[in-house]
């Protein structure tokens, strides 16, 4: 009976030492490993010889079904039969694949499984020629790309599908009824009234009326007063009572204190009237003293009363208070005949005008400042 070598490989042989728990090399040179098959006994055996010496056996291992073969790495394999552990460090991956694949097939045949040929040539090196074959594959790719272009016209038919969606806009008309919302904002202008008081507004109104209308009327009274001082005592009495009678032409300053909402306007007018009365009283005393030694010129202006009476006849309201006050003002009548009192009265009236104007301007400026401060405070 003869044995035949099935496959062989080259590698360094190791044995496992349980004492040191390490792999111990059996030789320092690679060994030749061969698997033998005995066709008569149907047995397998692994033989490993060190170097070129055919009698230096490193492995003489009978392969049975109990043997376990494992691959620790690509080039280091090991097998054991519960007594000895062998490790083979192959010189190349190809030798490792050849020996490992053949050994596994032997174990499979011993266990009753179908034999498989050892993968001795699974990785042939002629793989380099297929690389130049890749360039010829590019032309078909370009040819395939050309038919893809005609697929673009398929998209246009989808556009008409969107067209039927156009009828949706008619639903928009019901929106117009919303605009009537804006009217509520107008009630906002109320806050400015809270800035200043009603008394201040009334005071400003009275001061403005006094400065515009009252002063103009007093000027007319002053002009007319010059004539009666020379002619009749009735005109002088009417001018002296201008602050008390509301119906007279020169009595416009008197209503100002009554119509003013606050106390500032009334106090101002009261002070002005008091100053005016004092000035008139002071002016009347020297006139009486100066007119006392010259009573003779009194009969000269007797014909003058006729035009004055005719000029003052239309306003009946003015003639009535003159009759009432004539009795009270009879004593100073001699002073009216003198020409000097008219000039003195005009100067006093002019100074009084200036004082009234200055006082009114001051009060108006104060009122303006107060109104501005109130408006600024209300805004903050």
Curated annotation (Swiss-Prot):
PROSITE patterns: WH1, WH2. InterPro entries: PH-like_dom_sf (IPR011993), VASP/EVL (IPR017354), VASP_sf (IPR038023), VASP_tetra (IPR014885), WH1/EVH1_dom (IPR000697), WH2_dom (IPR003124). The keyword Cytoplasm applies. It comes from the Eukaryota. GO terms for molecular function: actin binding; SH3 domain binding. Pfam families: VASP_tetra, WH1, WH2. Residues 94-346 are annotated as: Disordered. Residues 199-218 form the WH2 domain. Residues 350-380 form a coiled coil. Residues 348-380 are annotated as: EVH2 block C. Residues 263-280 are annotated as: EVH2 block B. One of its GO terms (cellular component) is filopodium. GO terms for biological process: actin filament bundle assembly; actin filament organization; actin filament polymerization; actin nucleation; cell-substrate adhesion; chemotaxis to cAMP; filopodium assembly; hyperosmotic response. Residues 115-139, 166-192, 294-306 have a biased composition (Pro residues). Residues 229-249 are annotated as: EVH2 block A. This is Protein VASP homolog.
